Amino acid sequence: MRHITSFVFFIFIATNSSAQGCCSGGAGSPIAGGAATGVLQKNQMQVSANYQYIFSNKFYTENRDTNALFDNLNSNYIFYRMDYGVTKKFTFSIAAGYFFNKSLIELNQTDTIHSKGMGDLIFFPRYDLYNKTKNNIRTEFTLGLGLKIPLGSHNDSTLMLSHPSIGDIYAISPPTVQPTNGSNDLMFYSFFFRDYTINKIRLFSNALYIKRGYNSLGEKFGDYASIGLFVGKTFIRKWGVTTQIKGEWIGEIKAKEGIDLVADYNIDIASTGSKKIFFIPQISYIKKSFVVFATCEIPLYQYVNGTQVGSQIQITSGFNYRFMVKSPEIKTDDYDIQVN
């Protein structure tokens, strides 16, 4: 039942695609909770939806606790996706998400900076390079190349001052609360899977690299890289447990020539970028082709450049359903028989 781990990976891409991790211009680590995914059967479709909650009031200077810069950062996010097996080796996915809120609460809860709206549209084709079963052990290797296109706003503003003489004065909100980073990004992905059928144990790993582009404000968020190592096992037929150790790296934000990130957008470049390690348990309930799951991300190690809000609480839950769009065909010498 490999598909119990196939869907959290996409919400990981969608939310972490805008993560930068700086005190004035990042999203902490909302991507956390990645899971591996290979390909579907030919003519098989998968639909899934997930809800994700993120909260953090932890702040770090490098790897040390430090004083809070604001009260907390939190978000509520829903993510939906469709996959289709074009051939037995090639699967195409499309996904998008919506933030009900991304909020930065100031100290003493005196003020709130927040936004909501659509995040990114993700196109994610994957190709199975190797897939064989021998002695009840199945081995699979998959590569993917994806594209992330922003749908929501990356330049929402906040009212700073209102005066009868000069009117309203607005400032662009920090990237921590923007629904998207506003750039077109490329994604490079690999997946290795080994299934020990008799023991109902699965070992697998994935690697992801996101190459950022520049947005319309002249900002280029740091590239993102991660690698995950997984162990999964099915219990009592319908219950599955998967554990993951994930390491991630986020590069520093950059700007086009002539753009002053501090003066224009209050972003301190020295406080962007991070290295983190997470432990991610996941539990799933399987009913035929329908799966319900819940997962959480537990930070084990965090090192941030400068001073930033860190990762603290991230919980994801959702469902996944697979079905055949067309009945499989049995080929004979003279004609094809469609199985109903």
What would you call each of these model-derived segments?
Residues 43, 72-78, 115-123, 139, ...:
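Residues that define the transmembrane beta-barrel architecture of outer-membrane proteins
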Residues 47-55, 94-98, 143-149, 205-209, ...:
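Transmembrane beta-barrel strands of outer-membrane/channel proteins
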Residues 20-23, 36-44, 89, 131-140, ...:
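Short loop/turn motifs that connect adjacent beta-strands in outer-membrane beta-barrel proteins
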